[in-house]
Structures are given as structure tokens and as C-alpha cells.
Amino acid sequence: MGLQARFLGLLALVIAGKCTHSPEPDQRWMLPPGWVSLGRVDPEEELSLTFALKQQNLDRLSELVQAVSDPSSPRYGKYLTLEDVAELVQPSPLTLRTVQKWLLAAGARDCHSVTTQDFLTCWLSVRQAELLLPGAEFHRYVGGPAKTHIIRSPHPYQLPQALAPHVDLVAGLHRFPPLSSPRQRPEPQGVGPVGLHLGVTPSVLRQRYNLTARDVGSGTTNNSQACAQFLEQYFHNSDLTEFMRLFGSSFAHQASVARVVGKQGRGRAGIEASLDVEYLMSAGANISTWVYSSPGRHEAQEPFLQWLLLLSNESSLPHVHTVSYGDDEDSLSSVYIQRVNTEFMKAAARGLTLLFASGDTGAGCWSVSGRHKFRPSFPASSPYVTTVGGTSFKNPFLVTNEVVDYISGGGFSNVFPQPSYQEEAVAQFLKSSSHLPPSSYFNASGRAYPDVAALSDGYWVVSNMVPIPWVSGTSASTPVFGGILSLINEHRLLNGRPPLGFLNPRLYQQHGAGLFDVTHGCHESCLNEEVEGQGFCSGPGWDPVTGWGTPNFPALLKTLLNP
């Protein structure tokens, strides 16, 4: 104990000096609505922090992602194993030694790494953590629909300058879990003709996207799919059973999820969690499904980052992952965004398809130095994920053509440059659109999203054994598109092909083949005189509202089955 105290005293002298740096200088602190501070945390209370160690060979990783994802490449579909990725990106021996010695001197204990060795999660007392990270001051907060308790620091932290070449950031200090939930809209007014429907169900989706009763998993492959849920969002298997009883009688399906990764709470089911599971398992019917449920349950952990760590630590994973998480780009530090983007790159190299909801605030809006601008969302803006926008039926009571759902998120990143795979499509949109917002509102050279879309308006969901109508949001369209990609993977696996992997390079090369082009409607944005609440508008081909369009399953299967 005396030796540890001397170590801490020496450490405090070193890091209290001027030789420190701020890893995340642009990380803004703001207490989100619905969260309340409960005051300082007891100095002897223990917390868990995750240290992101500097990775190697990221340029080479990017090259390999391009090679395995481009159908014109001889390496197409020859994905890396987790061990291959680890060998490529793992930190240098010097970084590993330096960080481990630093943490040991601080009294950190029970440290756990991942297979790729680029993240280290350790337990420390609050007192030790505040000495280790000058400036940090840990408080407990409560908020969210489940009154979740989390520990965060309202002040920026510093690291010793000597650690700058070795540590990208420390997670678990600033970012609050985003509150993402689908909207429940009022029932549309009016009465449709014979043949009407009263909301989106699996049978409506299967009719619109041309899925037959035969379009289900065979049960003979190792095909699998997953959704991830955060912030105490739980599903109940009894809800899934009731949902399939009501809406799944016309197609073969699985009665329960194959695996839950993380803690599945006993509280009330969340509408978003129920929506994710029910529509992933009805669109990707009869395919083994995993649920990542609120991973990282300790108060100081970031659930989204903990999900990424799970992906970095499992050698065998589902082929398709759908996620409804999102944050405003400007609310996150550039270091954090880039580090998370690298995790998406690692997943793409391994042949995983990651689909993210584009968000439910249209183009978004915020004010910078008194000037309004659109507000892009992340991870929707990552160049290594496939982002799913939202549509509505032109006639809400009929299975008709689709138009833009005005809440569908979309736009241009202020962080990521435009990837080469989409330059031609974006240039064509900017050249041909007759309803472009003023150029000062968006970064025309940034990564543009979404890439695709699906219906996002008027879903039926069963939650806590109650059928709930008119649930809406890209939280609905994302699992639907993910399930359809899982069906295509099923055919590829049966034909001896690899799974689709990172879809975007192929998607843009095929110029929307296999998709219904959505050409009518605009999404919402800033409510000012200059744009009057209108963001971007859809048009022929790709657009930043619905991407290339919505799935026409037989045509999309034909397009993506080979090679």
C-alpha cells in the first residue's frame, strides 16, 4: 500500500506539471435534456475506463477494405480474419509497454484487452482516475426513459505529453448515451378504397418489396444477422411470439432470437428494441438472429463503444448488423469520430455489413456564428457503413409507390471527405437537382448519405404484449433493409459465395440496379426564411434523402447474387 501511495505521489507530480496535452480538445460538454447531476462521486468508488491505444497500418487497412469490397478487384470477397486484422493494426510493442506501465503506476487493476490489443479497459478508483487524468472530475448523472445512472466528467481531461504517441483517447468521460426512439404518429385521416391496409406489417412489406412465402432462410447455412440496442432498451421474447402470431403466419420464421449478447433486463420492453427485433426477424425471416443488448452496463462505460469492442473480440460474428444509434457530428470530438470510423473499417475488412439509420431530423439544423447550417449525423456519415433513409407510401392506406418520409435523415458530412465510390453519383445529383439549398448550408465535398432507404412510416409493433400502431422512423427502415440483405446472403452462401460484406462500393457501381427509385418529396430542415423548413429533395438516381432507393427483392437478388 505504501509503495502504491509513493507511485501515485510521483505520478501526481509528473502529470500536474505543464507537460500534458488534451486528446479531445473539440469535445463539447453539454448536459443533454432529461439528465440531472447527482453530484460528485465518492473518491473511493470504482469505475471502468477504456483506453484507445494508437493503431498501426491504417492506410494498409483502408487499401484492403477497398480490395475486398470492390467487385472488380481480384481480392473481392476474400475477407480478413480477426487474427489478420489484429496482426495488422495492433499497437507497437513500445505503445503496449508504455501504457501498461503508466496504468500500473496509477493503481489500475483488472485490465482487459481485446484480440486486436488496441483497446484496454481497466478498473480504477475515482481518486486514481482523477490523478491519472488531470482536469477530470467525476459526477453521477441520472436520465433517460429508464432513469439510467451514469458517471461522467463535466470538465476536459489531460494526458501526459509522453502518452500522446500512444493513446488516442480515454472513453467513458464525456459522451452521454443518445436518446433514440421511434416516433408514434397520429393515424392518417381519410378512408382508402378496397384493398387498403391499416399500417405497415410484414405482409405489407413483403408485398411492396416483392418477397414471396418462399423468400426465407433455408436453415441449412451458417447465415446470421444481428441488431444492437443501447440505453436500457430491452425486447421481450413474448412480444416477438405475439408479433409473429399476429403478423407472421404467412411465412416461415424463427420463434426466438438465437443469442443475446449482454444483459437482457427484466424491465418493460422498449418500443425501439421491439421494433428492431420484430422487423429484422420478419424481413430476414427464418435466419438466425443475435441481439446485442445494452453492452457495457457499468455507469462509466459507453454502450456504443462497448458494442464495438465486442466486435473486436469475436472471431465468428453475424454477417449483417443493423443499428439505430446516432449523434450529431458536431457533438463528438474529431478523435472519437475517427477512432470509431476505424472500427467500422476493421469490420468492413472482415466482411461485415453494418447498416445505420440515417436519423429522424431530416437535414438537421444548427447555428454557427449566427448562421444556420444543416447538421449531419454520425455514424450515418461514416464512409464505411451503409446508411438507410426512410420513405412513406404515396397513399398511406395502399401499397403504392413510395415518396420521401419528411423526417428521413440525410446530407453531407463535415468530417469525412467524399469517398471515391460515390463521387460520380453525388456530382450528378448536385448538377441535376432543381431544389438545392444554399451552398452555405452543407459541405458538398463531404461524405453524402443515405445510401439506400425503406419504408419508415406507420409500422405496427408489439411491445409489452400490446399491439402499437403508426410507429415511425428510420429505426424501422434499417432492420427491414438489413433483413433483406440477409436473405441475399442466404442465396450467396447456398451458391458457395462469400457474404456481401461492405456494400457501398458495389452499390454505387451498380447505379441503383435492383432498387425502386424514389423521386418525389423533400425532407425537413431549418425553420427560417431562407430555406423555410426544406432540406434536400429526392430525384432520379441517387439523392441525399433516400439514397439509391428501396429494395425490389427479386431484382436486387439478381444484381447481388454474383460474383
Curated annotation (Swiss-Prot):
The active site is at E272, D276, S475. Glycans are attached at N210, N222, N286, N313, N443. It comes from Rattus norvegicus. Residues 199-563 form the Peptidase S53 domain. GO terms for biological process: bone resorption; central nervous system development; epithelial cell differentiation; lysosomal protein catabolic process; lysosome organization; nervous system development; neuromuscular process controlling balance; peptide catabolic process. It holds the Pfam family Peptidase_S8. Coiled coil: none annotated. Its cofactor is Ca(2+). Optimum pH is 4. Unstable above pH 7. SUPFAM superfamilies: Protease propeptides/inhibitors, Subtilisin-like. GO terms for molecular function: endopeptidase activity; lysophosphatidic acid binding; metal ion binding; peptidase activity; peptide binding; serine-type endopeptidase activity; serine-type peptidase activity; sulfatide binding. Residues 20-195 form a propeptide. InterPro entries: Peptidase_S8/S53_dom, Peptidase_S8/S53_dom_sf, S53_propep, Sedolisin_dom, Tripeptidyl-peptidase_I. Residues 1-19 form the signal peptide. Disulfide bonds join C111-C122, C365-C526, C522-C537. This is Tripeptidyl-peptidase 1. It is found in: Lysosome; Melanosome. PROSITE patterns: SEDOLISIN. Monomer. Interacts with CLN5. Interacts with CLN3. Binds 1 Ca(2+) ion per subunit.
